[in-house]
Amino acid sequence: MTNDPINWHGTTILTVRKGGKVVIAGDGQVSMGDTIMKGNARKVRPLGKGDVIAGFAGATADAMTLFERLEAKIEQYPGQLTRACVELAKDWRTDRFLRRLEALMIVADKEATLVLTGNGDVLEPESGVVGIGSGGNYALAAARALIDMDLSAEEIARKAMGIAASICVYTNNNLTVESLDA
């Protein structure tokens, strides 16, 4: 950790799949060095025709570019989220411009939850819970501890994100939550 004023930090994104629902929650904080620049950024959004939800961690402009590219792949391969993500990952890894983009994405539809990285990885977590970003591991641990409780996917996501926000200085409680029937 440095106090370099150009060092952007932030974002916690968490996905919880439980009880016929899939939820992606993201915090709203964007930090530059040790300064909070924005507290209400929207890092989670629906894609396609609303049948896919996604969240990003990383540089905002990079993530917006990747969201646009992913939406194009979803349109190109309707109903085939994994294929659309693999095609995006191929482009991300091989395209001269795209490979410089620094972001991680979680993408989910009614059937799958996938993590996309700039290394060309498309990972499907073995459990229905995954976290990315500066507070991702805190949120992930909290959600795993809560998953067997009598709570909905959204309740678990909100509680876990609250726990992450209480630990990670780059995460706040201003949440954006999107959900789908799974």
Curated annotation (Swiss-Prot):
The question of whether Hydrolase is a record keyword is answered with yes
Q: Which UniProt keywords apply?
A: Allosteric enzyme, Cytoplasm, Hydrolase, Metal-binding, Protease, Sodium, Threonine protease
The EC designation for this entry is 3.4.25.2
For Na(+), which residues are the binding ones?
A: A165, C168, T171
Out of the domains of life, which is the source? Bacteria
Q: Which reaction does it catalyse?
A: ATP-dependent cleavage of peptide bonds with broad specificity
- Family statement drawn from the similarity comment of this UniProt entry: Belongs to the peptidase T1B family. HslV subfamily.
State the protein's name. Answer: ATP-dependent protease subunit HslV
Species this chain originates from: Parvibaculum lavamentivorans (strain DS-1 / DSM 13023 / NCIMB 13966)
Q: Which gene encodes it?
A: hslV
